[in-house]
Design a protein with these regions (language model features):
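Conserved, well-structured functional cores that handle cations and Mg-NTP chemistry
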Residues: 1-57, 62-65
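A short, structural micro-pattern
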Residues: 11, 71, 160-161
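A general structural signal for well-ordered secondary-structure junctions
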Residues: 51, 76, 101-102
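Phosphate- and divalent-cation-binding pockets in alpha/beta enzyme and binding domains
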Residues: 65-66, 87
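Short, surface-exposed basic-aromatic patches at helix termini and helix-loop junctions that form
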Residues: 67-75, 97
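An anionic, glycine-rich sequence signature occurring as long contiguous blocks
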Residues: 83, 87-162
């Protein structure tokens, strides 16, 4: 989402659908003054072809209705999960703390690690993915939910981990 502000006007916000593979914008939707991107995202999804694609959305857009719309249009989704979904975030967080689970996920090959060096620091991201979600009480509320992923991010600057 980006903002645009002219003198003496309130800023306008725009939700954009971006194709990483092709490197261009597929569509945009202005966010109405007394609204937010939660209402603009479904309207934008209605206007663009997404069949067979994977849609990624930040935590604010992680809504059951948005997931439903994506699945109805025969696409898949990766949605960021934070505290805006009741106990689901805490449930998932606790699950990934289970003893030996992260090692087991690595051994199954459902793990990826990336490192980037910038601004005299090293950023390491580790991703752990599992399809073991039968225990997740909210699973049925999210059409097409197949797996959960945990991202573990660490920063190292001058040899000190943050």
């Amino acid at each position: 989402m980006c903002a645009n502000k002219r003198k003496e006007e309130k800023p306008s916000h725009i939700v954009s659908a971006w194709s990483k593979e092709d490197g261009f914008c597929l569509g945009q939707k202005a966010v109405e003054e007394k609204s937010n991107e939660i209402t603009a995202i479904p309207e934008l999804l209605e206007k663009i072809q997404i069949k067979g694609q994977v849609i990624t959305i930040d935590a604010m857009g992680t809504q059951k209705g948005i997931a439903e719309k994506i699945k109805k249009k025969r696409a898949d989704y990766v949605l960021a999960l934070k505290g805006n979904q009741g106990t689901m975030f805490e449930d998932v967080k606790e699950y990934f703390k289970e003893k030996g689970l992260l090692k087991e996920i690595q051994e199954k090959g459902c793990y990826k690690k990336t490192q980037e060096k910038a601004h005299s620091q090293i950023e390491t991201r580790e991703y752990y993915q599992t399809e073991d979600i039968g225990w997740l009480g909210q699973k049925k509320e999210w059409r097409g939910l197949k797996s959960i992923v945990m991202e573990k991010k660490t920063l190292e600057k001058d040899g000190i981990q943050k």
